[in-house]
């Protein structure tokens, strides 16, 4: 039965589209986050660009707004035809400085508050301007609803295992050289940074490195929206059947929690509060951390007891079980999304 609202227009359902690219690459983790939102939608009538939420929309559209916002603060506030559920929301400090200069943006978020935030830093940023919030955790923790598998293979996946090194390397590449290089050379140049097998010897045994299949969440931006979502779902199905996943991507690690796939988050010293730590506080609390750093140092950094493993402490034939502390958040996220769609 079609739902209608007071205006008499049929209610439509939207899903985020992620076209923004970094040096010609897009992060498939954004699409994985939207796969989590898609689970709760009765259908998808249209795709809405995440960084152009003020685009033309001709009918009321329900949409779950989870993920990283806003790299394009000039495009806020969103179109009033959008009926949003703000959940698992992340806002970068630099973006917050810009977006909260306009009172209409603050008023917009207040209208749809409380805002579910996936990390503690976002809570602080919103509370500072009077927007009520709660800690929701990440919606990808619900992906087991659709993508879990009863099959468990012997595959080990190394998914951007040293992402912070990759990120720094990419950011240091000369923009001029990237622009002037032919496309093929450009991709090969980036590939040198994005497949760092030689860099992970200090974290993983050679046997695991040899067995592991490398997966990169950065993919070429010339793919269509449909192709990107197909790839995201392909990765989720891989992770669901894996014996072990080792990654420094939170939107690989969190889905693995949901899929009951043993996962180790490789932490190699992301100390920049604005760029990295802000994303991780509240998230890494619920997963196993693989690091060569001293456990006490990690606990002090996060201000609490964390699930920390040194490579030498791991039985690689029987990886440690995932913590279960995320499950209560996943249940609450599921209930909120289902209630949003029904009402």
Give, region by region, the residue ranges found by the protein language model.
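Active-site anion-handling motifs in enzyme catalytic cores
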Residues: 1-343
């Amino acid at each position: 039965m079609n739902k209608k609202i007071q205006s008499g227009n049929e209610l439509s359902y939207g899903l985020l589209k992620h076209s923004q690219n970094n040096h010609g690459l897009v992060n498939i983790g954004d699409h994985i986050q939207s796969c989590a939102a898609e689970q709760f939608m009765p259908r998808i009538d249209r795709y809405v660009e995440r960084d152009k939420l003020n685009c033309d929309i001709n009918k009321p559209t329900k949409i779950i707004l989870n993920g990283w916002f806003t790299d394009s603060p000039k495009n806020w506030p969103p179109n009033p035809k959008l009926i949003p559920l703000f959940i698992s929301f992340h806002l970068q400090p630099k973006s917050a400085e810009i977006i909260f200069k306009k009172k209409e943006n603050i008023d917009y978020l207040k209208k749809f508050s409380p805002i579910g935030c996936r990390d503690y830093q976002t809570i602080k940023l919103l509370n500072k301007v009077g927007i009520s919030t709660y800690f929701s955790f990440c919606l990808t923790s619900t992906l087991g609803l659709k993508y879990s598998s009863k099959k468990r293979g012997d595959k080990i996946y190394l998914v951007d295992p040293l992402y912070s090194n990759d990120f720094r390397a990419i950011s240091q590449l000369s923009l001029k050289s990237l622009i002037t290089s032919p496309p093929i050379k450009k991709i090969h140049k980036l590939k040198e940074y994005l497949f760092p097998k030689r860099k992970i010897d200090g974290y993983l045994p050679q046997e695991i490195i040899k067995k592991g299949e490398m997966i990169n969440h950065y993919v070429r931006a010339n793919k269509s929206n449909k192709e990107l979502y197909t790839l995201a779902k392909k990765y989720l199905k891989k992770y669901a059947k894996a014996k072990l996943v080792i990654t420094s991507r939170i939107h690989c690690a969190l889905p693995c929690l949901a899929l009951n796939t043993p996962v180790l988050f490789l932490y190699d010293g992301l100390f920049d509060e604005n760029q990295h730590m802000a994303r991780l506080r509240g998230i890494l609390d619920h997963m196993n951390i693989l690091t060569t750093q001293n456990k006490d140092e990690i606990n002090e950094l996060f201000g609490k007891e964390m699930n920390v493993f040194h490579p030498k402490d791991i039985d690689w034939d029987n990886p440690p079980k995932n913590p279960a502390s995320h499950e209560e958040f996943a249940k609450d996220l599921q209930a909120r999304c289902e209630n949003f769609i029904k009402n």
